[in-house]
Structures are given as C-alpha cells and as structure tokens.
Amino acid sequence: MVKIGARELAAVAIGGALGAVCRYLLSGLVPQVRGFPMGTVLVNVLGSFVLGFLTWSTMLGLRLSPEVRALATVGFCGGLTTLSTMAYETVELLKASPVLSILYLTANVVLGIAAVLGGMAAAHVVWSGRA
C-alpha cells in the first residue's frame, strides 16, 4: 500500500481545483456544434495529452516531487477531464440522435487514447538525449 501524506493530499486538492476551473472555462468558451458538446471533448483530449506527456516525461528522467506529480496528474488532469459529464452528454445525445451519441462517445475515447499517445511521443521528443 502506498503511503499518502497530507502534502500530497493538499497538492491533489489544489490541482483538482485548478483543473476543474480550467474545465469550466474551456467548456464555456467552446461552442456546441450542432448539439455536439465540443468543450467536453476538448478538455478530455487536452487532459489525456497532458497526462501522457507528464507520466512519460517522468519515465524518461524528468524529476518531479511527489507533491508536484500529484498536483499535476491526479489533481489537475483529474479535475480537467470528466467522465461523468461525458456519460451524461452521451445519454442526452442518445435521446436526439443515436448516431451522434455514438460518434460523441467514440470521439472521446479514441481521441483520448490518441492524445495520451501523442503526449508520450511529445515527451520522448522533448526528453530524448537529456536523461
């Protein structure tokens, strides 16, 4: 079992608050396209990219304190991305258009995975030869 200290918990809380505020702002700035909630897709893809970049960067030699790592990954990326909103919006889209709901769900999952891989590739480019 991993020991979690008060500093890591505080870091997760701060990162989560920052991520949630960013999600709220980004989701509000990005308009829906024909009922398609692009803001949620954007925050999920962005958060997936950042998480892939940070986790792969640490594997390639980037040194982050446990607090900074917790703040950035679990806190910020966790607060930025949103499974519950994606699930709700999928159900709402299903009422109007089953095809659109499937496209939305697929876009979130496929683009999220692609973003993690893209973040990992970007980290490799940034950190190759520096370790």
Curated annotation (Swiss-Prot):
<dbReference type="GO" id="GO:0046872">
    <property type="term" value="F:metal ion binding"/>
</dbReference>
<keyword id="KW-1003">Cell membrane</keyword>
<keyword id="KW-0406">Ion transport</keyword>
<feature type="transmembrane region" description="Helical">
    <location>
        <begin position="10"/>
        <end position="30"/>
    </location>
</feature>
<dbReference type="Pfam" id="PF02537">
    <property type="entry name" value="CRCB"/>
</dbReference>
<feature type="transmembrane region" description="Helical">
    <location>
        <begin position="71"/>
        <end position="91"/>
    </location>
</feature>
<feature type="binding site">
    <location>
        <position position="81"/>
    </location>
    <ligand>
        <name>Na(+)</name>
    </ligand>
</feature>
<keyword id="KW-0472">Membrane</keyword>
<feature type="transmembrane region" description="Helical">
    <location>
        <begin position="99"/>
        <end position="119"/>
    </location>
</feature>
<dbReference type="InterPro" id="IPR003691">
    <property type="entry name" value="FluC"/>
</dbReference>
<keyword id="KW-0812">Transmembrane</keyword>
<dbReference type="GO" id="GO:0140114">
    <property type="term" value="P:cellular detoxification of fluoride"/>
</dbReference>
<keyword id="KW-0813">Transport</keyword>
<keyword id="KW-1133">Transmembrane helix</keyword>
<dbReference type="GO" id="GO:0062054">
    <property type="term" value="F:fluoride channel activity"/>
</dbReference>
<keyword id="KW-0915">Sodium</keyword>
<feature type="binding site">
    <location>
        <position position="78"/>
    </location>
    <ligand>
        <name>Na(+)</name>
    </ligand>
</feature>
<feature type="transmembrane region" description="Helical">
    <location>
        <begin position="36"/>
        <end position="56"/>
    </location>
</feature>
<keyword id="KW-0479">Metal-binding</keyword>
<comment type="similarity">
    <text>Belongs to the fluoride channel Fluc/FEX (TC 1.A.43) family.</text>
</comment>
<comment type="function">
    <text>Fluoride-specific ion channel. Important for reducing fluoride concentration in the cell, thus reducing its toxicity.</text>
</comment>
<protein>
    <recommendedName>
        <fullName>Fluoride-specific ion channel FluC</fullName>
    </recommendedName>
</protein>
<keyword id="KW-0407">Ion channel</keyword>
<dbReference type="GO" id="GO:0005886">
    <property type="term" value="C:plasma membrane"/>
</dbReference>
